[in-house]
Amino acid sequence: MAEAAAAAGGTGLGAGASYGSAADRDRDPDPDRAGRRLRVLSGHLLGRPREALSTNECKARRAASAATAAPTATPAAQESGTIPKKRQEVMKWNGWGYNDSKFIFNKKGQIELTGKRYPLSGMGLPTFKEWIQNTLGVNVEHKTTSKASLNPSDTPPSVVNEDFLHDLKETNISYSQEADDRVFRAHGHCLHEIFLLREGMFERIPDIVLWPTCHDDVVKIVNLACKYNLCIIPIGGGTSVSYGLMCPADETRTIISLDTSQMNRILWVDENNLTAHVEAGITGQELERQLKESGYCTGHEPDSLEFSTVGGWVSTRASGMKKNIYGNIEDLVVHIKMVTPRGIIEKSCQGPRMSTGPDIHHFIMGSEGTLGVITEATIKIRPVPEYQKYGSVAFPNFEQGVACLREIAKQRCAPASIRLMDNKQFQFGHALKPQVSSIFTSFLDGLKKFYITKFKGFDPNQLSVATLLFEGDREKVLQHEKQVYDIAAKFGGLAAGEDNGQRGYLLTYVIAYIRDLALEYYVLGESFETSAPWDRVVDLCRNVKERITRECKEKGVQFAPFSTCRVTQTYDAGACIYFYFAFNYRGISDPLTVFEQTEAAAREEILANGGSLSHHHGVGKLRKQWLKESISDVGFGMLKSVKEYVDPNNIFGNRNLL
C-alpha cells in the first residue's frame, strides 16, 4: 500500500491518511467530475490522493476525540504539540503559554523560567531583576493581587437555543457549556484581555463550545447555525492580538465557539509536487514535527508557532521569521477550503498560478473569521535544510544598521531571518542572558565587549545589533554568510558571534511569558507591528517611540516608559517593524485606559509616518477604526459587499474588520 501511494505521488502521514471512499463519491455534488477526470487520465497518473474524509472516518474521529476528553489524555496531547479539548489542563487560563512555564524569583533572588520546555528553562538570569528595577521603576516587594482561579459564578450564563441543542446532539459532535471552556475561548492575548481575566471578567463570552473533527462536521455546524440564526466565532490556537476572539457585548444570539483544535491531521503529502494537505486546526509546532519525520518542513515560523494553527495563519495573513526563504503565508498556500453560510469555497484545481479573475484565496486570507471557517489547506513544503548557522552583527547605531539591511535587501541576499534591534532592545535581550557557568566564557564575553566598545569605539548606549539565521546547503550558506558580513562591514558592522545570534532566536518563544511576570509588579506591556517603505523606517521608529514617551508623561505615568523597536522582516521596497512598550502603572487610577489611549496614539503616529495598519497581526476589532482610511472608501465598500453576499445574516458575527 505504501509503495502504491508513493508511486501515485502521495505519502500519507500517520494512520489518519485518507484516500477517499465510495461514500465520498456518492456525495460528490458534481457527478460529471469523474468522467472529466477519466478523459484526462494521462494527466492524473501522478495525481494526489483524495483529500475528503469518509463518513466512517469522521465518526471514528468523533469517537476518538470523545475518548481523549478525559484528563488522562492530557500529557500525551501536551507532548505531541496538539491542543487538547481541556486547554486549561495544559495552558494558563489567565496568561500566556503552558502551565508549567512562568518567570519567577528563585531562591537566589534571580528571575528564572520554570519548567523544562525551553533552552532558557531552569536557568537563573542574574541581571534581569536589576534591569526591570532600573528601567521600569519596579519594586519587587510590591505585588499586584489577581484572581487565583476562575470562579464559574462570575461568568455570564450559557444561553443556548434548545432546538439547536437537540439537533446538535443528533450529529454526535462534541460540545461543552462549562464555564471554564467558554471563558478560555472568549479571548486572545491582547493586554486588555489578559488584564480583564486577572482583575474582572468579560461582559460576553461564548454560550457553547463545539469541537468538529473534520470538514463535514463544520458543514453540519454551519448549517445548524444558519437554520437557527446563531452566531459562530471560529477559534484555532487562540493567539490573536487584535481582539479577534472577543464576543460583541451586545450580541443577543447564541454564540458558538467553533474550536478547530481537533481537526489536526496531515491528510496527505505529495512528494512530487512538494505540497501537503492539512486540516486547519493543526498547530505550527505539530505540523513541523510530523513533516520533519518524513524529511520536510514548511519553513513558516511565526513567533506563535507553538500554539497558532494553519487556519489562523490563513485567516490573518500571517508571516514567519524565515519568510526570506519560504515566503509569507500567501506565498505558501496552494489551495484553501472554507465553509460559509452560502456553501463551500474552493478552487477546482491546485495549479501553482491561475489567471481566472481576482484570486478567491485573497478573499479568504485575512478574512479573520468573518466569512466562514477554513477547514483544510494545501501548502508548499520543502526538504529540511541540511545546514543551519546563526550569526550577529554589531553596528555603531541603529541608523547604520537600517542602511545595511536596506542594502542586503537591495542585493536580494537576505538570510532566512535577519532582525535588527535598537539599543534598548539589545540591552533588554542582554538582561535576559543566563548565568555563565564558565569563567573562561565570562572572560571571552568581557573581551568581546571591550573590543567593540573600547577598541572600536562603539557607544554602549547607541550600538545596535542584528541577529542572523542562515540555512540551506552548507556550501551555499557559507558563501551567503560571507556576502552578508562583507556588506555589513561597509556600514561599520562588526561580527558579534554565533552565540549572540542563537540566543536572540532562542528567546523568541519565551518573551511572551515576561508580560505575565510584569503584570505581577504593576507593569503593563504590549507589542505591535507595522510595515513601511525603506525611506520611512528610521523616522517612523524614532517618532513612534517619542510619541509613546510623550503620551505617557501627559497621562501621569510616573516612570519613563520602556519603548523599543526592531526591524524584523525585510523586503525589496520596505520592512516590517516590531515595537515593544511598557510602563509602571503604580499611582494611576485607570491604567487600562491610559494604556489603550497610548497604544492608539502610537498607531496614529505609525499611520502619519507612512506605516501600514498591520503587517501580520491583523485588524480584528482593535484596529478596525482605521481600516477604511487605510484601504479607501471604495475598498472598504468592496469588503462589505463580499460579507453581505457570503454571509447575509451575519452568522460569522465576530465583527472583525468591518
UniProtKB/Swiss-Prot annotation:
Residue numbers of N6-acetyllysine PTMs: 102, 347
Gene Ontology MF term list: alkylglycerone-phosphate synthase activity; FAD binding
Region annotation Disordered: where it falls in the sequence: 1-41, 63-86
E.C. designation(s): 2.5.1.26
Basic and acidic residues composition-biased segments: 23-35
Alphabetical GO biological process terms: ether lipid biosynthetic process; lipid biosynthetic process
Annotated stretches, region: Important for enzyme activity: 615-617, 654-658
Residues that hold substrate according to the record: 515
Transit peptide: first to last position: 1-58
Protein name: Alkyldihydroxyacetonephosphate synthase, peroxisomal
Organism: Homo sapiens
The gene coding this protein: AGPS
